[in-house]
Regions:
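A Rossmann-like FAD-binding core segment of flavoenzymes
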Residues: 70-107, 111-114, 176-275, 320, ...
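FAD-binding core/adjacent interface of flavoenzyme oxidoreductases
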Residues: 1-12, 27-28, 32, 40, ...
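Glycine/Thr-rich phosphate-binding loops of Rossmann-like dinucleotide-binding domains
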Residues: 42, 127-128, 170, 192, ...
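Short, well-ordered coil/turn residues at beta-beta hairpins
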Residues: 120-122, 127, 162, 251-252, ...
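Beta1-alpha1 glycine-rich phosphate/pyrophosphate-binding loop at the start
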Residues: 3, 7-79, 169-196
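A conserved FAD-binding loop/helix module that cradles the flavin
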Residues: 169-171, 292-338
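FAD-site-proximal beta/loop scaffold in flavoenzymes
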Residues: 6, 132-153, 244-303, 311-318
Length: 342
């Protein structure tokens, strides 16, 4: 199928949810494409933590993020779904002709006609929160890093982690045995990280393998073309210290933006898209799945994103062809996989 022919389902987002949506579309015999602003499939997993282990994916005691993406991409693309990477969706229009009409998704350089849409955009376009101090841009990728793509780059380094969430605490654990020393500072004494990981870091501190300080923030960065020292400040006592540091890794969350999707008339709750029990939005023909969605009891997990992708795609297929059952049956009995029905 030509890349710009009318497709049954266009999926916005190439992370785990979008990849599983593409797989399910193919399994249901629907033509599909994935459009993503990032240059590679995998979403946040590849953009932010390809070398981190994930422990809560069914069937894997643990799996590296990059390996999960590799396998999900192989699964997703086996039925001919096309990928359009580095493409930011800038517009949407409706063409009311033919069998009930269709949508056209527009990017800066292309147009993609589609019968239905599944938005699996995660948190949307994202940018790491900066420290907000003078001159930090001078040291970016020269001792100041806002993500960890390869932990080996910190081998033998004196590392300062900044933050109180899962990423900061996870790397305080995962850089053990790699970094020469690890200090983790946070501006408060409460943490958003998982309690088990917080306990791990406290235990590492008791063993002298990590230093955890609360109520401390980065005040200034120092160096000559490359980061050499950091001044930190205690917000309670106003004490300051200047430390010899090789790498500062602020893990303070992200600014996110759904971009043009916000202009489509979709019902939203804060930055999330409201969906019903079949993952349908308030706009007929547009579904959503994964972290971008909001509904009562919503959990933002890879596992739930996969389930939501199934629900969205099966209902999209049914909306295109009302004779198609919503429930696809069991994949173990499907001829499409080379199996014959019993």
């Amino acid at each position: 199928m030509a890349e710009h022919e009318l497709r049954d389902i266009s999926i916005i987002g190439g992370g785990p949810t979008g990849l599983f949506a593409a797989f399910y579309a193919g399994m249901r015999g629907a033509s599909a494409r994935i459009i993503d602003a990032l240059p590679a499939l995998g979403g946040q997993l590849m953009a932010l933590y390809p070398e981190k282990y994930i422990f809560d994916v069914a069937g894997f005691p643990k799996v590296l993020a990059k390996d999960l993406v590799r396998d999900m991409a192989a699964q997703a693309l086996q039925f001919g779904a096309t990928t359009h990477l580095g493409e930011v969706v800038t517009g949407l229009r409706r063409v009311d002709e033919g069998d009930g009409g269709h949508f056209v998704l527009e990017t800066a350089s292309d147009s993609f006609p589609t019968r239905t849409i599944v938005i699996a955009a995660g948190i949307g376009a994202f940018e790491a929160r900066r420290l907000g101090i003078e001159g930090e841009e001078l040291y970016e990728e020269k001792g100041l890093y806002f993500k960890v793509l390869d932990p080996r780059q910190f081998e033998g380094k004196r590392v300062l982690l900044v933050g109180g969430g899962d990423s900061a605490f996870d790397w305080a654990v995962n850089l053990q045995g790699i970094a020469r020393s690890i200090m983790l500072i946070h501006r408060r004494d409460g943490f958003r990280a998982h309690a088990a990981t917080v306990n791990q870091v406290h235990e590492l501190q008791r063993c002298g393998q990590c230093e955890l300080r609360t109520f401390w923030e980065v005040k200034a960065l120092h160096g000559n073309g490359r980061l050499e020292r950091v001044t930190i400040r205690n917000s309670k006592t106003k004490d300051e210290e200047t430390l010899d540091i090789d790498a500062v890794i602020p893990l303070l969350g992200f600014h996110s933006d759904l971009g043009a999707i916000k202009e489509w008339g979709l019902d939203t709750e804060k930055a999330d898209i409201k969906v019903d029990q079949v993952m349908a939005t308030n706009v007929p023909g547009i579904y959503a799945a994964g972290d971008v969605t909001s509904y009562p009891g919503k959990l933002k997990l890879i596992a739930t994103g996969a389930a939501e992708a199934c629900i969205a795609v099966n209902n999209a297929v049914h909306s295109i062809n009302p004779k198609a059952k919503v429930n696809p049956g069991h994949s173990s009995n499907m001829a499409i996989f080379g199996q014959k029905d019993d």
